[in-house]
Amino acid sequence: SLFGILSTLWSELTFSNYARLLTDTPFLRWMLNSLIVSALAASVAVTVTTLAGYAFARFRFPGRKYGLLVMILLQMFPAGMAMVAVFRLLQVMGQATGGWIGLNSLLGLSLVYIGGGIPFKTWMIKGYIDSLPKELEESAYLDGATPHQTFRQIILPLLGPILAVVTVFNFITPYSDFIFPSVLMQSGDRYTLAVGMQGFVSGNFSANWSLFAAASILGSLPILALFFSVQRFLVQGLTQGAVKG
């Protein structure tokens, strides 16, 4: 009886929806746009937050305390509150740069995610660096290492687990977001994957759930690839301190 029920749910196995998705819709264009925005946002944000987190954790300078406080305060407000300001800012930047950075620009959209992800991720990396013993750096200084060499050769290799987490966060957020791209992207060839997929099911009487499901499966592949590529760093972070000695 179980097989009889299953046969009524899936009466026929077909891959025709994948073929239609790839040939009759700009799905690949949408996915490429999402990958460009996500990769750019993740790479820049990880670089900036790593340097900022190290500076806040290891150096004492004027404005350090207030800088950390401002980053906490920025996280108290939802991103949607800044929608009008971001829209107007990109509108002005688009006029000033000839459209390179502005509305309907992948670079402009990337900058939105870069700016939005820096405060919280900086705190994450700072907290992780605070847990590392300062004696490691002091030993390197005694051996004649410069601050740059100490960071690059001593600290950076130890940041694998937290950098993996920050990279995943900074990649998934722009890749799956719908609100900002739907407002800032104004032409179909600039849509990200989430905005494009919404068009499959937005009609009251023409929702195409088959194409939507096929797009969901294919759209999840980059996320899976990213998780598998950083899996060993995530596991390393989870198991640190689990074994004594």
Model-inferred region functions:
Residues 1-245:
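A structural signal for multi-pass alpha-helical bundles of membrane permease subunits
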